[in-house]
Amino acid sequence: VLLGAVLVTGSIINGSKLSFSILGISFQPSEFIKILYVIFLAGVLSEARSRMTIFLSAVLAAAHVLVLVASKDLGSALIYSITYVILLYIATRKLFFILGGMAGAAAASVLSYYLFSHVRVRIAAWQNPWTDISATGYQIAQSLFAIGTGSWLGMGIDAGSPRSIPYVEQDFIFSAICEEYGILYGICLVAICVSLFLEIVHIAHVCEEPFLKYASYGLGIVYIFQIFLTIGGNTKFIPLTGVTLPLISYGGSSVLTTMLMFA
């Protein structure tokens, strides 16, 4: 319902409907619903995993993803999709679901490319940001400049110019960190994030209760995949998705959701 409300009444940011305001306070429902989404999937998959159960879980996951796609929030749609596919594989141990998910993701990527103009712009900027560095390639070019300028040890606090990157507090915070604190600091940050993910996986592995096991795995997948999308986009490893870096990027909805996940 909340995702549908954003689709109808949400404000458009960078071509996507991500949030709506209540009494002047902006909310991004897709962030909060991640937790409920994982809990529901864990509950369904912890019961008897019949074909009907799997079908119903697939319908629910598809409904969430389709609403997000309609809102043009493709980064969140990708997180929801990947989380479902991996959780389904963990619950059933059937490789078919992974292969099917990969095929579906490839088809969805091609379809999104032709349906959404901002996706085509991001793909073009990712392929070669230098061809239009003053316009479509400006963000990713400035991001790479910032990382390169910071080098291994960084330029120092307030010594860089991260403000030259549009939306640096939300989408490009990793580049700003590397510019001022250095690539080594960025590597340490990634190592901390990975260690947190591995701890979540360990907790899930030792859980004997299926519901808690799948819920832990699901929240861990959401966390690490969001980090992958953000840092991958900042470093030009993958196209930009507009996803925030958990606990680091500016954004109350993202920070609060991540805190609730760890709680």
Name each model-derived stretch:
Residues 32, 152, 255:
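Residue-level recognition of oxygen-bearing side chains
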Residues 129-170, 174, 183-185:
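TM-adjacent membrane-interface loops and short helices in multi-pass inner/ER membrane proteins
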Residues 73-78, 154-157, 168-170, 187, ...:
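Transmembrane helix boundary and interhelical junction motifs in multipass membrane proteins
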Residues 36, 172, 254:
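Active-site phosphate/pyrophosphate-handling residues
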